[in-house]
Amino acid sequence: MDNILKASNMEGTSTMTVTSRSSEDSSCISNHEQDTDTHKDGDTSGLENSKISKRKWMKEFFKLSKSPASKSSRSIGSMKSNQSLVSMKSSDDGNSYKNDYSSICGNSLPSAGLSRSNSVKELKLDSTGSQRSKNNVAMLARSSTTSQTTCSSSSSSSSYNSIKGNENDILLQNNNHFRHNKEIPQSKGSSNINTASIMSQYNVDTQATAIMSDMQKQYDSQQMTSPFVNEDLHFDPNGEVSHVIKAIFKEIGYKYDDFSDIPVFQLMQEMYQLVKKNSSARRTKITDYASKLKEKEAQLKSQNDKILKLETTNKAYKTKYKEVSLENKKIKEAFKELDNESYNHDEELLKKYKYTRETLDRVNREQQLIIDQNEFLKKSVNELQNEVNATNFKFSLFKEKYAKLADSITELNTSTKKREALGENLTFECNELKEICLKYKKNIENISNTNKNLQNSFKNERKKVLDLRNERNLLKKEILLIECHGSYSLLLVSNILTCYRFLLPSDTIIETESLIKELLNMNNSLSNHVSSSDEPPAEYSKRLELKCVEFEEKLLYFYQELVTKKIIDVIYKCFINYYKKSRQTDQKSNQNSSTPYKQSQRQVPHSIK
């Protein structure tokens, strides 16, 4: 009897977990089927994901069905904690499901504790959400009331950093729980939120408010004439900053036609109020989006944790089902023994009988859930059968293609034999061509060697030619220097003739002038003859030698006989005679001078003049 009481207590705890698990399994299955039905028409990737999830679920179910029954010595406290966690399941939209323990277990089982825990947690969530919203509203009120640009910029940067941090946390959690989130359909509201675009608009508004508040402060503090304001405190449309102000108006959304008639202070106030409204509205939107994102994060975390716990409870459910079936058999055997024996405790038997009836009803309900699961598995098996039929049809098509390919392979074999015969002929011809190519290669190598030798000889000859050219250029330069020296020496002789013409006879003067002209002409003809190299080298060398000999003879005659003997010697003699006469005249003048301080004037003879 003690064993029967222990079994009954174990049955009570196990059936509570089983019923809660079965109800949540059925709700999860129904929700999953609804989500898959809604996404079938819209997206083909949803079908593939649903099939993969079904197959995974089937594999896990068969593994659990094949696994051995767990021992009955498992702790009741862990089962109760799983039961309380299973009871707290919330949907994707934020609505929480009610506990079904009272409807399943009846009035005899205490389910008030579970419902209380659920309600308390919901109140905690609501209180935290309200506190966050209050804090966000307070921050927005502070940022809107203050007129300083530093406060607005700091609040915008802090809110932007908080939102970016939340987004990074969501991305990390999605990456960590990617395996579990594949089967859960995501909400459409979270995917449509473009936080980057909202924050860019918000930054533009904060910058505009900062600019306008700075301009207003400068205007109130200084009240000085500016390059874009008239004397009547109106904007100058032809000023320096008018196009900048128009661009700011367009960014803010302020409509203007002609702002030359509006005072500056009034226009600034209107723009400031408009920017205030836009920035406050956008800040409220940002805070709403941040709160929604945090709620979605909490929902995803709770759902992922619940899925893991549901998997563990499913395993426990199967093991407990086997234990309950064994205990049911024991109870039936005990009832048979009690019928045979004479037992007077009728009240206890009635209570136990009622308890066993309740357990049997629960077992029947569990069997119905298993039947529903079997129907779901049958549907999946039918789908798999359809896939098998489709693959068989594809296999038949592949067979037909294989037959066609076999025919084409036979044709290819015949064609390959023909090509092999042609290939043998081509190989024979190729061998002949290779021999010819070897001969040509040897000839080419010989030619290349001779070409290299010719190139080397050509380079040597070219170097010689370049050396000769350099020598020729040097000779030309020397000839030019000699010509220059000769021409200047002839000019010197002609200058001497002009200076001492009165001392020389006319025959020598005429002869020297004619020789100077001839020598100059010969010098020019030699230079021209050297520069022109169109004649053959033998004739060119002969003509040069003849001209050089003539030129040398005339030069010797000119300098040795004419210049030295007929000109320089005559001038030298005249100079000596003049010097002697001048000495004699000096002596006479010194003797005849009467005054000591009177200088003697030397008279130059008329012949020297």
Curated annotation (Swiss-Prot):
Annotated region described as Disordered, given as residue ranges = 1-50, 68-96, 124-165, 586-609
Q: Where is the composition biased (Basic and acidic residues)?
A: 32-43
Q: Which GO cellular component terms, listed alphabetically, does the Swiss-Prot or TrEMBL entry include?
A: cytoplasm; meiotic spindle pole body; prospore membrane; spindle pole; spindle pole body
Q: What does this protein do?
A: Involved in the pathway that organizes the shaping and sizing of the prospore membrane (PSM) during sporulation. May provide a meiosis-specific scaffold for the assembly of other proteins on spindle pole bodies (SPBs), and may be a limiting component for SPB formation.
Where are stretches of biased composition, namely Low complexity? Answer: 68-81, 143-159
The coiled-coil regions, if any, are 283-342, 357-393, 424-483
What family does the entry list? Belongs to the MPC70 family.
What is the protein's name according to its record?
Sporulation-specific protein 21
Transmembrane ranges, per UniProt, are: none
Key word tRNA processing present: no
Q: Does the UniProt entry include the keyword Transferase?
A: no
Keywords of this entry: Cell cycle, Cell division, Coiled coil, Cytoplasm, Cytoskeleton, Meiosis, Membrane, Sporulation
Task: Point to the regions of Polar residues compositional bias.
Answer: 10-31, 82-96, 127-136, 587-609
Report the GO molecular function annotations: structural molecule activity
> What are its GO biological-process terms?
ascospore-type prospore membrane formation; cell division; meiotic cell cycle
> Quaternary form?
Interacts directly with MPC54, NUD1 and SPC42. Interacts with ADY3. Interacts with ADY4. Probable component of a SPB complex composed of ADY3, SSP1, DON1, MPC54, SPO21/MPC70, NUD1 and CNM67.
Q: Localized where?
A: Prospore membrane; Cytoplasm, Cytoskeleton, Spindle pole
